Amino acid sequence: VPSDYDAYLQETGMPENEIQKLDEHVKQFIVDDLKNGDGKFEYMKIDVGKQAMNGREEDFEWIEFYASAFQIGSTIYIYPTYEFAENKKPCGNDSFSFLLGEAIRPYEFGGTLWYKDRTMSDWEVSGNLIANNQQLNGASYSGSQLGTPRSAMKFMGTTYCHASVGTGDDNRILMGYSYQPKEVRVELFGWRLSRKQIIFVLAGGVVVGSVWWRKNKGKTQK
């Protein structure tokens, strides 16, 4: 049976297949936040990508990324979300990062973390998420707030990003998760270079890799 949250999201023009990808808790998180906004939001299509930050792309089969965006006037609300598909054990040094194209200029961040162990049938709230590294074109959430469980379990982090319409037409979002980095946190950073973007992957202030994020390509280039 479709929930009230489904009905609200349908009203925004969000496609049904996108709605059904979302966990019920995530739908509620999004709808509650949209209702706190100023007026009636409409679904906004964005180009979603992901980046393996400390490993190969195939290492990322155990994590799912989602992002939905909604717009009213010059205001955009975006919800970058990750979900573990397998039980894992974050070490207190993980990070979840996202970068936005120049069409979106963020100014406020926050979120909620859920957990679910082997004995649980539904998610429980772990706590609030705070963007402890905020950029002009994105943010990262890192450290013990992403979970430090004694045994492996699933985590789901839903974040909100309130933004205003930017200068360009590049409406991509690139998300990445760094799982159990060896010594220091790994985060995404971006510098705009004319019509392209180069994404630096940083570990403790040292560039450990870079990615060309091209304007007219659907996927990221290694």
Positions of predicted regions on the chain:
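N-terminal propeptides/leader regions of secreted preproproteins
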Residues: 1-61
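Mature secreted bioactive peptide module from preproproteins
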Residues: 48-218, 222
